[in-house]
Amino acid sequence: MRLVVCLVFLASFALVCQGQVYKGGYTRPVPRPPFVRPLPGGPIGPYNGCPVSCRGISFSQARSCCSRLGRCCHVGKGYSG
């Protein structure tokens, strides 16, 4: 039984190495996500490009974060979402 399992594994590995399993032709590598430049005014939250704090950001940056992500700054309260 072990011999059969070993032979099946080796045969499937050989097919993958030869490229017989993938019939779609050349597959290019997955591109990296674009680099997000940090905004001035504080640390950056994960994957969103908006500062964690509302302090020190411009009105246009605050409006952009609010419209794109629903993270809206309120006077004296910080982010709402």
Curated annotation (Swiss-Prot):
Residues bearing the modification Serine amide: S80
Entry GO terms, CC: cytoplasm
Modified residues (Pyrrolidone carboxylic acid): Q20
Keyword set includes Zinc: no
Record InterPro entries: Penaeidin (IPR009226)
UniProt subcellular location: Cytoplasmic granule
GO BP, one annotated term: defense response to bacterium
UniProt KW keywords: Amidation, Antibiotic, Antimicrobial, Chitin-binding, Disulfide bond, Fungicide, Pyrrolidone carboxylic acid, Signal
Family per record: Belongs to the penaeidin family.
Function: Antibacterial and antifungal activity. Presents chitin-binding activity.
Protein name: Penaeidin-3j
Phylogenetic classification of the source organism: Eukaryota, Metazoa, Ecdysozoa, Arthropoda, Crustacea
